[in-house]
Amino acid sequence: MAFARLALIFFLAASVMFAVKETEAGIPCGESCVFIPCTVTALLGCSCKDKVCYKNHVIAAEANTVNDHHLLCQSHEDCFKKGTGNFCAPSLKHDVKYGWCFRAESEGFLLKDFLKTPVDILKMSNVIGN
């Protein structure tokens, strides 16, 4: 009897999981943005389009120009101007003329921050190490 209950629980969990998986792609993020922008779902990667919150990749896939979405770019300068990152990654599809803005932390940025550290802190860490 316990085996039958356990099998039923696994069956229900699997059916719910597959039902959710099928509806993920094009469904809005769950809130409207008529008067206020996507607030809670913005952390989940949602943006406002046509007064409904959609996932960013859905909006970007339907975009015709770079100006249709704040994360789309054609160069690194587009990302700087829009304030959405510092690196424009090109699309994997060769027929798509735009890319996606990312905030990239490279070794140059880390070195720049390291060079701004006061000299006293560097001496202190050397004393602690000895």
Curated annotation (Swiss-Prot):
Protein name stated in the entry: Cliotide T7
Signal peptide: 1-25
Modifications after synthesis and translation: Contains 3 disulfide bonds. This is a cyclic peptide.
Any one GO biological process: defense response
Tissues where the protein occurs: Expressed in root, seed and nodule but not in flower, stem, shoot, leaf and pod (at protein level).
Assigned protein family: Belongs to the cyclotide family. Bracelet subfamily.
Function text: Probably participates in a plant defense mechanism.
Keyword Disulfide bond part of the UniProt annotation: yes
Propeptide span(s): 57-130
Domain notes: The presence of a 'disulfide through disulfide knot' structurally defines this protein as a knottin.
SUPFAM superfamilies: Cyclotides
InterPro entries for the chain: Albumin_I_a, Cyclotide, Cyclotide_bracelet_CS, Cyclotide_sf
Disulfide bonds: C29-C46, C33-C48, C38-C53
Crosslink site: Cyclopeptide (Gly-Asn): G26-N56
One Pfam family matching this protein: Cyclotide
Domain of life: Eukaryota
Upper classification of the organism: Eukaryota, Viridiplantae, Streptophyta, Embryophyta, Tracheophyta
Keywords carried by this UniProt record: Disulfide bond, Knottin, Plant defense, Signal
